[in-house]
């Protein structure tokens, strides 16, 4: 039998970077077109987030240069706040590092993998370092070539130069050389990604230089810069035991009571007193041997009758005092079991819904501006639903835009977004697709959806978008999100229905008018023979009569539409 030491001779600890190097497909680097789009997406996402957090109207320029067969140089430049020199290796060379991953805050990137994953993909396909040029607007520009040490999950600068900055340039430019990718103008390519990004971010000016040198500009159509999202405290209904235990070890609060009030939303002194009772009640219920009676107590607790449950046990005040004492000890001394008790009690308690002030939707006006500016439709409308929560305590918000006709070609298109970021892949498994296809579009005057000149835009906003995978291209089918998407679509579709109904009525009126006008000459000729009146005079009379009748009908129709809109 082999010895244990021999069996474990090949045992090796794998770094996060090494894991993702071997599993790049998990980050979206699968397929030649998709890999290039993913790489551009990660860089553009970083640029937009940085500009908005600094209150700067984003200017993003993307250049794709073909160096050989399936071999490109990708350049992304922005006018953001720049990156301090000491953070360059962390931003571009360390997985699970960033300004967002550890915060309960809405952002385009959430996992701290994005741009460093792009650097790694470029490195493993071309062997080249990523060139970074950046300045915070001070007197120097930093030029650095960054590589990732996959064994240590660390970035390293293989070459660095400093240049004077007499004009005070501020921003970041990155150049990545990448192989085994392909540029195509498909609906999964870079052009399409930037087009959809421009629609959801009308405050951004975006430029693309394609491999053939063609310049495409998506101009800024709104001067409004979204306010930076606000970090939100975790809600009691959305936390795990590990969350409470880990936060307790890190907090600066001096008691468990102060910790709970200060680190979580919707917890006050009064709520902590209530929590004490629930924990005490749960401790007492677990001492009951009769399972049927135990279930009855749990049911009463779920209904909020905590005091009645406590009074059912002799000496319950002693247990309440023990729990109250726990609330006054230092948080760092909180045990795992005590954290479990707190989270279990949370499940039975009632809390106000989490605050939603930290969510930053695009907004109805800006959705309409984005759709009009890029698609040039004949009709556009947008709906932003009120914030809701899923999984008991995670806030989210759904927005929908509909664009119809005009320069939109025949054929239904669904534009999917999460926190303003286009989702181009894995549409079949996405809750947005499922919700859109569940709608009976015929009710809204769309008889053949697949041939209609219709674009449906759906944006899901949340501090934690429930993606189906690390590639972040598909949103999981969560009931609360699914229902909100359906409600938003139906609201917008009713407005489209009103527009199409009016359009159909007008077309019918035009047809009727042409029918009447067609017979005017013949009628005028016959009446002229019968009455002796001039034919021209009779013809003019009938034309004026038809015009007055249809004009009054149009006035009545406009009035009816106004009443319907205000109803």
Swiss-Prot record:
Organism taxonomic ancestry: Archaea, Methanobacteriati, Methanobacteriota, Thermococci, Thermococcales
Purpose of the protein: Relaxes both positive and negative superturns and exhibits a strong decatenase activity.
Subunit structure: Homodimer. Heterotetramer of two Top6A and two Top6B chains.
Listed GO biological process terms: DNA topological change
The keyword Transmembrane helix belongs to this UniProt entry's keyword annotation: no
Protein name, per record: Type 2 DNA topoisomerase 6 subunit B
GO CC, alphabetical: cytosol; small ribosomal subunit
Binding annotation for ATP: 46, 78, 99-100, 109-116, 472
Family: Belongs to the TOP6B family.
Reactions accelerated catalytically: ATP-dependent breakage, passage and rejoining of double-stranded DNA
Ranges that cross the membrane: none
The organism of origin for this protein: Thermococcus kodakarensis (strain ATCC BAA-918 / JCM 12380 / KOD1)
PANTHER family (alphabetical): DNA TOPOISOMERASE 6 SUBUNIT B
Pfam families the record matches: HATPase_c, Topo-VIb_trans
UniProtKB keywords: ATP-binding, DNA-binding, Isomerase, Nucleotide-binding, Topoisomerase
């Amino acid at each position: 039998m082999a010895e244990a030491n021999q069996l474990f001779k090949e045992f090796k600890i794998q770094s996060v970077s090494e894991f993702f190097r071997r599993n790049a497909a998990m980050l979206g680097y699968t397929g030649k077109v998709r890999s290039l789009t993913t790489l551009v997406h990660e860089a553009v996402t970083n640029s937009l987030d940085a500009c908005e957090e600094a209150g700067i109207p984003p200017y993003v320029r993307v250049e794709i240069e073909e160096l050989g067969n399936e071999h490109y140089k990708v350049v992304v430049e922005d006018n953001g706040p720049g990156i301090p020199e000491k953070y360059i290796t962390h931003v571009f060379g360390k997985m699970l590092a960033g300004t967002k991953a550890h915060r309960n805050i809405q952002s385009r990137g959430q996992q701290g993998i994005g741009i460093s994953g792009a650097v790694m993909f470029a490195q493993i396909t071309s062997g080249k370092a990523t060139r970074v040029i950046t300045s915070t607007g001070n007197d120097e520009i930093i030029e650095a070539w960054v590589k990732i040490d996959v064994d240590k999950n660390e970035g390293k600068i293989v070459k660095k130069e400093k240049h004077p900055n007499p004009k005070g340039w501020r921003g970041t430019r990155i150049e990545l050389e990448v192989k085994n990718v392909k540029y195509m103008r498909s609906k999964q390519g870079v052009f399409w990604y930037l087009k959809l990004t421009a629609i959801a971010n009308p405050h951004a000016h975006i430029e693309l230089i394609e491999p053939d040198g063609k310049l495409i500009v998506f101009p800024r159509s709104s001067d409004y810069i979204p306010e930076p999202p606000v970090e939100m405290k975790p809600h009691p209904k959305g936390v795990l035991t590990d969350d409470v235990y880990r936060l307790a070890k890190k907090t600066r609060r001096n008691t468990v009571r102060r910790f709970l009030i200060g680190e979580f939303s919707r917890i006050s002194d009064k709520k902590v007193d209530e929590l004490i009772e629930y924990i005490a009640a749960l401790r007492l219920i677990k001492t009951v041997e009769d399972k049927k009676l135990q279930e009855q107590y749990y049911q009463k607790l779920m209904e909020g009758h905590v005091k009645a449950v406590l009074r059912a046990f002799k000496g319950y005040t002693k247990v309440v005092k023990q729990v109250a004492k726990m609330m006054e000890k230092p948080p760092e001394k909180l045990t795992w079991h005590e954290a479990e008790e707190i989270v279990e009690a949370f499940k039975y308690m009632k809390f106000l819904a989490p605050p939603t002030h930290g969510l930053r939707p695009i907004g109805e006006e800006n959705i309409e501006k984005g759709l009009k500016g890029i698609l040039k439709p004949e009709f556009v409308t947008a709906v932003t639903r009120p914030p809701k929560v899923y999984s008991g305590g995670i806030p989210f918000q759904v927005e929908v835009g509909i664009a119809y006709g005009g320069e939109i070609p025949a054929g239904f298109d669904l534009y999917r977004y999460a926190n303003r970021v286009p989702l181009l892949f894995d549409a079949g498994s996405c809750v947005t697709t499922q919700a859109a296809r569940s709608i009976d579009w015929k009710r809204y005057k769309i008889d053949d959806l697949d041939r209609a000149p219709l674009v449906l835009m759906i944006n899901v906003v949340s501090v934690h978008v429930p993606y189906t995978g690390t590639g972040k291209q598909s949103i999981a089918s969560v009931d609360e999100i699914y229902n909100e998407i359906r409600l938003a679509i139906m609201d917008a579709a009713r407005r489209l229905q009103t527009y199409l109904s009016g359009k159909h009525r007008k077309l019918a009126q035009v047809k009727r008018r042409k029918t009447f006008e067609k017979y005017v000459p013949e009628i005028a000729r016959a009446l002229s023979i019968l009455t002796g009146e001039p034919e021209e005079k009779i013809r003019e009379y009938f034309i004026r009569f038809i015009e007055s009748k249809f004009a009054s009908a149009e006035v009545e129709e406009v009035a009816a539409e106004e009443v319907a809109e205000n109803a």
